[in-house]
């Protein structure tokens, strides 16, 4: 009889596995063992855990990245980068060495197949880890400076990368910065810090500064409004310093009779001069090397001023673009139109002028010897009467503001100089506007004299505490000299001027004519004597006296070739009445002769040069005279009407 097995217990899968452990073990041992290399994530994670083997590999990788640029084959580069471009989340402060090695890689040495992943890695790294945000910004902003090489013997500057590759790197850097700002808006201040730190040194070639400045202008397309003003200030501070340095170099060359020529006349383009000098690269003297640097500086200032004007034009209303459509064809704005990156919370277009106005106060009013950069504001105000009105009102408020520190007093004096420059030089400032402001200035001067100039026994003229008064006085004299021809043609204006009693200020114990610019004083004296307003020539000292203020004359000359086509139509030449021409010529010729004691400079002064002060219609009245003297802008020559001898009254021929 067979035993039934229906009720026999069945083994579960667990019991089955336990019943044959040897079989499982033999199957595992039968598989061949392969030593797989650890991935980049595993190396980093184990290194952070303190694993010794991982620490050794970590150091080897960091050392290998130092020689990354020397590798000829792309395969090992791709293999190495593949290990780390996807593990930005695994990085932290203890992996700083590895991160710095990756950030320092030259972008042109990274294979094109992984360059996009490398870009995304930098974005993710800056967004995820606060400790690396500034490091990423610094490395990326450095890529906004063009890569160049300089031959020390000849000073010839050559680009390391092609224009196409360099522009690709610029675009990649802007993409990274804009992406990080969009995801991490609070990092804007860290970006600003890097922008200021990466600014090329003054000893670097001008082409690097020009390229960096253009990228900072493009950055305005996407950076938040909270740092937009600060970036513009960084741009204008550097431009003002370079402009001042260029002015000092030109003045030193005039005094030392250096053979260096900048060749800034109409017939010779700056670009042609530079190319002509760089051909003879075998034997370059120190003088030629210095000349080449000066020409590069002029090109750089011209290029950046043109770029800023281009940005301003792209930001104004379309109505202005339509009115000046022909002018836009002359403007190379392709670099700006092709830039498509935008950002959130950028500076509104209508706020751009207010930002520039603040930058003028913070960077330009204390910059004494700036020649060219200040013309940017002259151009900006020409686009709208509202801009012109805002500018004049703001400058006047800064002028009469109560100073709390010596720097505030200098700023007030600078504001008075700019106010005078706008009223005297800008063609778009109407006669009525200039007269209204001139009357406002005179009323302030009269009140100042009544308050501080009464009681001659207690007044010591020429003190620095009265510096603002003397700067405003010079502004009054300058504007009157430039615009009196228009005022006297209006009987009501002329009668109003006679009622002012200008002698009340001129003959006050503060003696303003004694402490202002001598050419301005002589010109004002000759004009007022001709109009029988006041006789004051005897007040002007023969010898130069120390001025209690830092005088400046914005918009006095403009020799930058490319951007001059936007500036020269806005400028007003000094144009007296025809009957006053001979008197003014004698006064200014006498001043030029005494300013330069040399016999050669005295012989250069001729009566025909006085015609530089005339417009074309006045020149016709002089009986067929040629009217204009062809100017040569050489630093080794001196002329009757030059910036150093007769500031404020320089003719405007380019």
From Swiss-Prot:
InterPro entries: RNA_pol_I_trans_ini_fac_RRN3. Keywords: Nucleus, Transcription, Transcription regulation. GO terms for cellular component: nucleolus; nucleus. GO terms for biological process: transcription initiation at RNA polymerase I promoter. Its main location: nucleus. GO terms for molecular function: RNA polymerase I core binding; RNA polymerase I general transcription initiation factor activity. The keyword Transcription applies. It is found in: Nucleus, Nucleolus. Residues 1-37 are annotated as: Disordered. It holds the Pfam family RRN3. The keyword Nuclease does not apply. Residues 13-31 have a biased composition (Basic and acidic residues). Required for efficient transcription initiation by RNA polymerase I (Pol I). Belongs to the RRN3 family. This is RNA polymerase I-specific transcription initiation factor tif-1A.
């Amino acid at each position: 009889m067979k035993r039934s097995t229906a009720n026999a217990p069945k083994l579960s899968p667990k019991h089955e596995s336990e019943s044959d452990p040897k079989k499982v073990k033999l199957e595992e041992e039968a598989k061949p063992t392969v030593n797989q290399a650890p991935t980049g994530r595993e190396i980093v994670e184990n290194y952070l855990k303190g694993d010794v083997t991982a620490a050794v590999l970590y150091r080897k990788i960091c050392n290998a990245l130092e020689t990354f640029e020397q590798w000829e084959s792309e395969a090992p580069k791709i293999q190495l980068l593949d290990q780390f471009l996807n593990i930005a989340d695994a990085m932290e402060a203890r992996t700083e060495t590895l991160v710095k090695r990756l950030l320092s890689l030259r972008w042109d040495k990274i294979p094109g197949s992984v360059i996009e992943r490398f870009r995304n890695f930098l974005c993710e790294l800056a967004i995820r880890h606060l400790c690396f945000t500034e490091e990423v910004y610094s490395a990326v902003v450095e890529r906004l400076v063009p890569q160049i090489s300089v031959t020390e013997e000849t000073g010839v500057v050559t680009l390391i990368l092609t224009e196409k590759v360099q522009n690709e790197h610029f675009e990649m850097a802007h993409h990274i910065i804009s992406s990080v700002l969009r995801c991490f808006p609070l990092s804007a201040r860290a970006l600003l810090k890097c922008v200021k730190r990466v600014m090329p040194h003054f000893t670097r070639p001008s082409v690097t500064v020009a390229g960096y400045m253009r990228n900072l202008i493009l950055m305005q397309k996407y950076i938040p409004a909270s740092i937009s003003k600060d970036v513009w200030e960084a741009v204008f501070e550097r431009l003002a310093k370079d402009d001042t340095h260029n002015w000092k170099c030109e003045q030193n060359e005039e005094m030392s009779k250096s053979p260096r020529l900048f060749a800034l006349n109409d017939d010779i383009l700056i670009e042609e001069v530079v190319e002509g000098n760089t051909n003879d690269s075998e034997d370059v003297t120190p003088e030629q090397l210095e000349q080449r640097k000066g020409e590069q500086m002029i090109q750089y200032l011209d290029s950046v001023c043109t770029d800023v004007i281009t940005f301003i034009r792209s930001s104004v209303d379309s109505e202005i673009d339509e009115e000046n459509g022909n002018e836009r064809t002359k403007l190379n704005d392709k670099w700006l139109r092709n830039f498509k990156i935008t950002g959130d919370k950028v500076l509104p277009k209508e706020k751009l002028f207010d930002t520039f106005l603040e930058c003028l106060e913070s960077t330009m009013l204390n910059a004494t010897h700036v020649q060219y950069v200040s013309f940017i504001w002259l151009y900006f105000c020409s686009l709208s009467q509202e801009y012109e009105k805002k500018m004049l009102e703001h400058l006047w408020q800064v002028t009469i503001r109560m100073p709390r520190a010596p720097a505030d007093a200098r700023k007030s004096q600078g504001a008075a100089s700019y106010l005078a420059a706008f009223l005297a030089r800008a063609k778009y400032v109407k006669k009525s506007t200039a007269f209204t402001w001139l009357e406002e200035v005179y009323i302030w001067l009269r009140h100042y004299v009544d308050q501080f100039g009464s009681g001659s026994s207690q007044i010591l003229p020429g003190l620095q505490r009265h510096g603002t008064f003397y700067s405003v006085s010079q502004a009054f004299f300058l504007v009157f000299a430039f615009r009196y021809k228009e005022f006297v043609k209006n009987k009501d204006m002329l009668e109003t001027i006679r009622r002012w009693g200008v002698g009340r200020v001129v003959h006050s114990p503060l003696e303003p004519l004694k402490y202002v610019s001598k050419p301005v004083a002589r010109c004002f004296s000759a004009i007022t004597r001709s109009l029988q307003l006041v006789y004051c020539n005897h007040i002007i000292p023969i010898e130069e006296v120390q001025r209690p203020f830092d005088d400046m004359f914005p918009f006095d000359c403009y020799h930058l070739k490319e951007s001059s086509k936007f500036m020269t139509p806005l400028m007003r030449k000094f144009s007296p009445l025809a009957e006053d021409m001979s008197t003014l010529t004698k006064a200014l010729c006498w001043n030029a002769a005494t300013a330069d004691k040399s016999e050669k400079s005295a012989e250069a002064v001729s009566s025909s040069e006085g015609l530089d002060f005339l417009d074309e219609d006045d020149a016709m009245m002089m009986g067929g005279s040629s009217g204009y003297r062809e100017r040569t802008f050489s630093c080794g020559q001196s002329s009757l009407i030059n910036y150093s001898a007769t500031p404020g009254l320089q003719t405007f021929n380019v």
